[in-house]
Amino acid sequence: MYAVVRTGSKQYRVRVGDVIEVEKLPVEPGQAVTLEEVLLVERDGTVTVGQPVVPGARVVARVLDQVKGPKLIVFKMKPKTRYRRKTGHRQRYTRLQVEAIEVGAAS
């Protein structure tokens, strides 16, 4: 059984037990998170596609950690003027472990 969920303007294909990194969510490590935007669910060979979401479906996950991604260097330069700017950016992510995929009343 797997599901496709949308969070932080990105889509993730998840199974129970998977660990995924999503855009930062305002939660503490150890808390449970419910992802309501389930776009697709596959169960026992039957695929249910939402229009746009599957009604009654949700993914329950546990927050493992708040982490930062790799540093990206942003370098601006204008020729012949000695203009140079170098900055870095590290995106923040929330690491989740999928605990359950629930569809309708039965899960």
Swiss-Prot record:
Keywords: Ribonucleoprotein, Ribosomal protein, RNA-binding, rRNA-binding. Pfam families: Ribosomal_L21p. The keyword Secreted does not apply. Signal peptide: none annotated. One of its GO terms (biological process) is translation. The keyword Ligase does not apply. GO terms for molecular function: rRNA binding; structural constituent of ribosome. One of its GO terms (cellular component) is cytoplasm. PANTHER family: 50S RIBOSOMAL PROTEIN L21, LARGE RIBOSOMAL SUBUNIT PROTEIN BL21M. This protein binds to 23S rRNA in the presence of protein L20. Belongs to the bacterial ribosomal protein bL21 family. Part of the 50S ribosomal subunit. Contacts protein L20. This is Large ribosomal subunit protein bL21. The lineage of its organism: Bacteria, Pseudomonadati, Thermomicrobiota, Thermomicrobia, Thermomicrobiales. The gene is rplU.
